[in-house]
Each structure stands twice: as C-alpha cells, then as structure tokens.
A protein has these predicted regions:
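Glycine-rich phosphate/diphosphate-binding loop of Rossmann-like nucleotide-binding domains
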Residues: 347, 352-466
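Short acidic, glycine/serine/threonine-rich loops at helix termini
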Residues: 221-223, 244-255, 286-293, 337-343, ...
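Rossmann-like adenosine-cofactor binding region
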Residues: 442-532
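N-terminal ligand-binding/catalytic initiation module
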Residues: 8-13, 31, 42-44, 49-350
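Adenosine-phosphate binding glycine-rich loop
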Residues: 109-110, 353-357, 370-373, 492, ...
C-alpha cells in the first residue's frame, strides 16, 4: 500500500523545529475516494491508500463533495478527531486517486524512489522508476549531497524550489534536518534575489494568480484550488513592497510561497491546506516592464477606485470560497498596507505581517534587551529610522505594550521618534505624511535650529535607548552615529533590520567594534557570531507562524491587538 505519512512534530520555537516529518509505520484510517469523479470509466480503481496526518478540521461526520489539493473532485468521508483534541492534525489514511505520471507529478503524494515494489505495481510506476527502493533517509542523503554541489545561495534556492514542486515530504524533511543552513536559503535573505529573478528562473507555477483586468474571475480562480473546508491559511501580496527591494510585480508570489513554507515548518499547517495568492495589479518597476521575459502585467500599477474594487471583490471571494481561512497580508505598499488592514481586519481573521508581525518580534527583542540591562520600558526612548509599514508597526506595538503597562498613550507616543527620507517627522510635515505617521510627529518649535535631516544630530538630541533600522539604506548607521548613541547609553540597543543583507543599516561586527562589544544587536537576517557573541535575529518567522497557528486552531473570527501582543 502507498504509505506516505505527513506528521507534525511540536518542538521548541526557538529552534524552529515544528516541522513536517515523514513516517511509514502509521495505522491506517481510510478516506474512500470515488474514482469515477476523477477519471473516465476505463480508469482502474485502486484500493491502495496514502496515509498522512491532516490538518485539524471541524468534526465533520457527513459525506460531502470537495476538491482535493491537487485540484480534482473527490468524495471524502471525514472522521472526527478525539473529543478533547487540541492537536492540529488528525491521523488517518486516504485512498490515492492518482497513478503513473499523474502520481509522480503530484508533490503532495509523490515519494519518488521511496515507492515500494508493491506500490509500484499498484500504481503503474514500475516502468517509471529505477529498480532500487530508497528510504527517506537515503533520499535525504542524496538530496543534501546534490545541494552541497551548488556554490551560490541562489542556486541552492533554485534546487529547493525544484524539490518543493516534486516531493513536499522530502522538501520539508530536508529543511528540518538542516534547518539553520536552509531557512536563509528558502527565506530571507536569499528569497529576495529569487523573487527579483522570478520570470527568468520560472519552472513550474505555484499558487493562484489574480489579474486586476479580470476582476469577475476572482471567485472562480480561487475555487480552482479547493472547496470551503480545504484551506486553512492564505498569504496574499500585491508585491509592491517586497523584502526591502520594492515593487517586484508577479514575482511577489514567491514571498507568499516562502511564508507558507515557514507556516508548515514552524506552525505545523499542512502544506496541502495553504494557499499563496498574487494580486497582479501591474508594476512600476521599469526594469520588469521592459523585460520581454517578464510574466506579469506590464502596465503601471493601477490605484484608486479600480484597485479598491478589485481588493473588495477578492475579500468577498475569500469569505465565500474559504470562509474559515486566516488571511495574511504580505508586502503591500505603505499607502495600502495599513488602510487595507484596518478596513478588513474585522471582516475576516486577518493580519498584516509587515506591520503586526514585525512589531511583535521587535517588541519581544526589546523586552529581552531591557530585561538584560535592568531597564524599564516606561523610560525607553526609541528612534526608528524608516517610517514605512514595518517602522510604523514597530512603533504601534511598542506604544500598545506601554499602554498595557499603565503608560498613557499620548505619553507613550512621545517616546517614539520616526525618521523617513525627509528626516525626523515633524508636525509641519502633515501634508506629506500619512495619518499613521503623523500621530508620532514632533513639535517644530522643540526642534528649531537642529538639523532634523541628519541622523547623527537626531541621535544626539533624542539620546535613544534603542535605534531601529528599517530604511533599506545600507550603511546608514555610521560609526559617528553609533558612537554618539554610545556616549549617552552604555548598553545601546541597535536593531538593523532591513532585508536583504546587503541593505542592512550596519553589520554586527562594526556595531560591536564601535561600542567595545557593549551593543545589544539583533538583525533582520542571520549573521555569524562576533567575538563569541551570538547575534540575535529579529525575523518575522519567530512571530507569524505561532500567531497563524493559534488563529487556525481557535477558529478566531478576528485577530486583535491583544493577540498580537500576546504573540
């Protein structure tokens, strides 16, 4: 029998080992599949089964027709979990409706060389595979050796992409076994380069593509993937603000894919029950628009009413097609990210990772740093260099946390200082700042005579406890800026967070050198230790998987600010 079992292990979040594993010894619980709905009448019926742990579902006992994750209609009988189950998954078996090339081309079911001889006979695979049967461990050894032959991170990213679209069990098992090495390959910082080169390195489509020129097709396109109980988690992006590298058009689907890979690795959501969605509304990236190989719409980004109507239809379609799914907004531009979150967060369980996820993980790091140095959050002054979605999310999360600890909101906002390309945000900038930025604007009179465009001068006057960088301005935290901060702060807390790595405001080695190893540093991408000091990583992958998992398990109807703070 075909025995490909996917199970979820729960382990310490700090080690990122909630991940997909494989086993071939699970007891079977069958989900019969009606073959006639999948193939013509001359397709032979198989009694062999595929076993796997399936993500937690409501306890359905009735028979119903749904679409499978491979896009075909099938009749399933769902078995209820144990009465007091709090686990994400339910063990069981399903009959596999696929055979031959169709089975080998389904990444959710394909086992490659691990199909047993019995399975090869039952599923018409004998002529399609070499005779030797491999274990998963042998497949892992072969795959890792192939990976090690590759010299560049981007080449390794290509290899992992190819593996993901062939065999998801092997893909997740390989990452789990080499997680410290491979997360930077499948996620930041390497994924940014893969996104930028998407149309040139394209191999096989993944996810759902929604075209703003065909808004009436949204519901039909979403329904291509499955039915109302087939999807737990959706990541959607319009690709305007990708990972610090800006507008990447159709390539933004890759950020949704990589986020969902982490949802499986760290949150335990089944890879067949997640959905990456790309909203193609055009691109303002002139390089992409001139590229004859670019695969998306080449017209300029559509904004205004047409854009809003398109988003409205998308939200309504999600609520109708996948009513229980959590919606994760990812890498929208600064003009749209916050307003879309505020508009739709109470219509369906949704959150914006750039705003709320970033804020949560930075808040956690700040709390840890203050605790380490015996300082109080109420006395903390934070200077955020970069006032986009991430910077504002960090500011809001710090303020919310202060408020929950008894600080007046107005007083809390006075302790947050924002800088953008014009310098420190002042009240006179109201016409050129967003409402979310303006609540942190400082009085022009208080800053009269000070060069508010100079980071050094602002640091000299603010005397920040914590300096946060999300500006994508490489090298912005210069030696004189850091030394000025260190004059007033014996243990400066410095978070250069911009991604990819080449856009970091400073590298940890310099920060430690300029502060005589006194700085408390956390970065947005992984860095090696400095003089024996381990560099912490302020990455969203430490926040959104747990938040998403909690929302899926609880069937939350709204993701509140208190839930973000708890995360």
């Amino acid at each position: 029998m075909l025995r490909t079992r996917l199970s979820v292990s729960v382990a310490a979040r700090s080690q990122l080992t909630r991940s997909l594993t494989a086993s071939r010894t699970a007891p079977l619980r069958r989900w019969p599949i009606q073959q006639s709905r999948l193939y013509s009448s001359n397709t032979r019926s198989h009694k062999a089964t595929t076993t796997r742990e399936n993500t937690f579902q409501k306890p359905y006992s009735d028979e119903e027709v749904t679409k499978t994750p491979v896009g075909s209609r099938a009749r399933k009988i769902f078995e209820a979990p144990h009465p007091h189950a709090t686990r994400l998954t339910v063990e069981g078996a399903i009959e596999c409706p696929l055979e031959s090339f169709q089975l080998l081309n389904s990444p959710l079911f394909n086992k490659g060389s691990a199909f047993t001889q019995e399975e090869r006979e039952a599923f018409n695979l004998e002529a399609l595979l070499p005779p030797q049967v491999n274990t998963l461990d042998e497949q892992l050894e072969r795959s890792y050796k192939q990976l090690c032959y590759l010299k560049t991170p981007l080449a390794k990213n290509d290899f992992m992409t190819s593996l993901r679209v062939q065999n998801k069990v092997l893909y997740f098992a390989l990452i789990r076994k080499h997680i410290k090495e491979l997360v930077p390959i499948i996620y930041t910082p390497t994924e940014g380069d893969a996104i930028a080169a998407y149309s040139h390195r394209f191999r096989k489509p993944e996810g759902v593509f929604l075209d703003i020129t065909e808004p009436d097709s949204i519901e039909r396109r979403l329904a291509t993937y499955g039915g109302d109980k087939d999807v737990d988690y959706i990541v959607v992006s319009d690709s305007e603000g990708i990972l610090g590298i800006g507008d990447q058009g159709i390539g933004g689907v890759r950020i949704a894919i990589s986020k969902l890979a982490l949802m499986t690795l760290c949150g335990g959501i089944h890879p067949g029950r997640v959905l990456p969605v790309c909203l193609d509304v055009g691109t303002n990236n002139k390089k992409l628009a001139r590229d004859e190989l670019y695969m998306g719409n080449k017209f300029s980004r559509i904004r205004g009413k047409q854009y809003d109507d398109f988003l409205e239809k998308f939200i309504k379609a999600v609520k109708k097609v996948y009513p229980s799914a959590v919606l994760h907004f990812e890498d929208f531009g600064v003009k749209n990210a916050r307003r879309l979150l505020e508009k739709y967060r109470y219509e369906l369980p949704s959150f914006n990772d750039d705003i709320q996820g970033t804020g949560a993980v930075v808040m956690a790091s700040l709390i840890a740093a203050l605790k380490h140095t015996n300082r109080d959050l109420k006395d903390t002054r934070v200077l955020i260099y970069g006032a986009g979605s991430a910077g504002l999310g960090i500011a809001d999360q710090i303020v919310n946390h202060m408020v929950t600890h008894g600080v007046d909101k107005g007083e809390a906002r006075k302790k947050i200082f924002l800088m953008d390309r014009r310098g420190l945000i002042l009240q006179s900038y109201e016409a050129n700042s967003t409402p979310a930025q303006h609540v942190y604007a400082k009085s022009d009179a208080e800053w009269a005579g000070i060069n508010t465009r100079s980071l050094h001068d602002v640091v000299e006057n603010v005397k920040p406890t914590c300096l946060v960088g999300c500006s994508t301005q490489a090298g912005a935290f210069t030696q004189d800026v850091v030394e000025e901060m260190h004059k007033h702060n014996p243990r400066p807390i410095i978070f250069p967070l911009s991604n990819p790595t080449r856009l970091h405001e400073a590298v940890p080695a310099d920060l430690m050198k300029w502060t005589n190893n006194n700085a408390l540093v956390a970065t947005g991408s992984p860095f090696p230790p400095v003089d024996g000091y381990r560099i912490s990583e302020n990455n969203n992958c430490y926040s959104f998987p747990g938040l998403g998992l909690g929302a899926v398990l609880s069937r939350a109807t709204t993701i509140t600010d208190k839930m973000i703070s708890a995360a």
